[in-house]
Design a protein with these regions (language model features):
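Non-globular targeting/processing and membrane-anchoring segments
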Residues: 100-139
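Short coil/turn linker and secondary-structure boundary residues
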Residues: 30-34, 93, 137
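Structural microenvironment flanking redox-active thiols in thiol-disulfide oxidoreductases
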Residues: 1-43, 54-64
């Protein structure tokens, strides 16, 4: 959680979404959403934290952990702007490496956004004429 808090403080919210996942392996009765809210308040965690659901058919690994092939906690997953898992770490990862990888993904997303904006501007600047050609009909 301290590293996630540093990421949230370092990168702009429009560039990087920080989301926590509360996983429960034991003492389920004590690990309620209410106790999680108290923990987040006490430790001043200011990013969303989801509560993982129990494993399917009593499996010991919670559902989201299974879906993302997480080996345990802590796990850190970097997902790019297209929704593709690009990096995943089990255990600690250095802030320097993580910062460089996040910056790389932000730069890729910004470049993709710029290319999309340029393409839209080019399409808008081309005159639209009504009629049909080999490609189809415009209105």
């Amino acid at each position: 959680l301290p590293q996630a808090t540093r990421i949230r403080a370092t990168f702009a919210a429009e560039d990087v979404a920080v989301i926590g996942l509360h996983t429960v392996f034991e003492h389920h009765a004590a690990m309620t959403p209410t106790s999680l809210q108290a923990f987040l308040h006490e430790y001043r965690i200011h990013f969303p934290v989801g509560v993982d659901r129990a494993g399917i058919d009593g499996a010991p690994t919670p559902r989201t952990m299974s879906a993302y092939f997480m080996q345990g906690t802590p796990t850190l997953t970097l997902i790019d702007a297209a929704g593709v898992i690009r990096y995943q770490y089990f255990g600690q990862v250095s802030d320097m490496l993580l910062g460089a990888q996040i910056a790389e993904l932000v730069q890729e997303a910004n470049a993709l956004h710029s290319r999309s904006a340029e393409k839209m501007a080019t399409q808008k600047s081309q005159p639209q004429t009504a009629g049909c050609d080999d490609q189809g009909c415009t209105i």
